[in-house]
């Protein structure tokens, strides 16, 4: 299962306020819902691609939230600096194995 998510809640039209960290937490909140629907947990996640509008400014905060979310055994991850849609700071593509 692959999901590409942003910091825009499903019921919203703009990113959650609070910067890249808040957007990353919103992405993980949405992903938890998808994992629950698939009847798997975070250990099923095998890779993550992060797309950041401001890598230098935001990578430390995003890294901290990533570690909090995945704990001591995080999946493979790549981070890229990109030009995201207006107003967005983070986008993530998460891949999980469904057994």
Annotated model-derived regions:
Residues 1-99:
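Short, polar/acidic, helix-capping and beta-turn segments at strand->helix junctions
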């Amino acid at each position: 299962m692959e999901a590409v998510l942003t910091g825009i809640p499903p019921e919203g039209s703009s990113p959650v306020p609070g910067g890249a960290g808040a957007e990353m937490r919103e992405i993980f909140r949405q992903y938890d819902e998808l994992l629950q629907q698939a009847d798997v947990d975070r250990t099923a996640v095998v890779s993550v691609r992060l797309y950041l509008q401001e890598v230098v400014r935001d990578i430390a905060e995003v890294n901290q939230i990533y570690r909090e979310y995945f704990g001591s055994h995080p999946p493979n991850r790549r981070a890229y600096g990109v030009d995201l849609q207006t107003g967005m700071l983070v986008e993530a593509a998460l891949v999980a194995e469904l057994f």
